[in-house]
Amino acid sequence: MKVLQILPELDSGGVERGTLEVAARLVDDGHESLVISNGGRLVAALENAGSRHIQMPVHRKALASLAEIPRLRKLFAKEKPDIIHVRSRLPAWLTWSAWKSMDRRTRPRFVTTVHGFYSVNAYSAVMTRGEAVIAVSQSVRDYILTNYPQTDPAKIRVIHRGVDERVYPTGFTPANDWLAVWNAAHPGLEKRIPLLMPGRLTRWKGQPDFIRLIARLIALGQPVHGLIVGEPHPKKLAFLAEIKALAESLGVIGHLTFLGHRSDLREIMAISEIVYSLSTDPEAFGRVSLEALALGKPVIAYDHGGVAEQLRPIFPQGLVKLGDLESAIDLTGKILKGRARPLSIKDFTLARMLDSTLAVYRTVLTRPR
């Protein structure tokens, strides 16, 4: 089986990581893996794992991108993949436009993955045009059927994103060298209780609620310290200044550390007592929360979207009503006192995700054209 995955770029993020994971599994199983993107820092890792990469500007939202359609059609005819798997809207439009003009009897099978709650319009509808459509959560499946009711429910397969338990083992402890560097960079933190808020710095991710939570816990006498991991989009740097001003106004700027982008989030989660997901809009999935649960860390999250789907079978006591900060504060105290721990992530493993994805490929290949 030859599988061609297409996405805008290979820099960082859940879509990109999932692409590399599927590619590596294909190679390990003896299949041929090819990825088209505009490139990025993950290309080397992709190629080192045995896949081929073809760089094309499939990321540009411009009229010039239409020139890629005949190039893609020519490439599909040359490479003859069995499966084309697209993971983003612009590449999906370019791919679909090239694919639909090919001979129906011999063209590759067309698979899409809906990774998020896209704005509802004709542009986003292309993600439902796959001969098989993968939804990364039940919430995303519901979004598809609610907003694109013409989509055949039978062709949608829910495949939750998965975590590699070898990389995120329960009870993981950072290396001594890492701990030494961390403690030197953050003196005195070992005397506090670290609480972690990971995620891109943007309003809907919930950092303001986390800062208010830290302020209330400090007022209640809890010796906590908030760790905020993530950076804002370059065009939204004002939000970082805004939440720092909020921390100043609440008198807790000294009880927070803004860590920016980190490549050692696993280690930071491991030394944190609780990890938070306080997004005011539902997450399509929320992979970082699952990684924390895999490490055995309690997660406190608002009860909606893909994160709630993870917590219900693994750590249901970590769910609080959307916006109910008082309940999140009370729950924090109870967890710190009782040291509750999540159950196994057995239904959300990387192996299960990859098995299910390859099963979709095999199934769509057997369907009538």
Language-model segments: residues:
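A conserved mid-protein helix/loop that constitutes part of the nucleotide-sugar donor-binding site
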Residues: G13-E21, I193, R200-R216, A238
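Short hydrophobic beta-strand element within catalytic cores of glycosyltransferases
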Residues: V35, P298-A301
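Short, structured helix-loop element that forms part of the nucleotide-activated donor/catalytic region
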Residues: R41-E47, L227-I253
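Short His-centered aromatic/hydrophobic patch
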Residues: V86-A92, V114
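A conserved, positively charged/aromatic
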Residues: K100, R104-Q138, Q150
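Active-site donor-binding acidic/aromatic loop of nucleotide-activated sugar
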Residues: K235-L240, I253-R262, I268, L319
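Acidic donor-binding loop of glycosyltransferase active sites
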Residues: A270-A284
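Conserved acidic donor-binding segment of nucleotide-sugar-dependent glycosyltransferases
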Residues: P313-E326, G333-K337
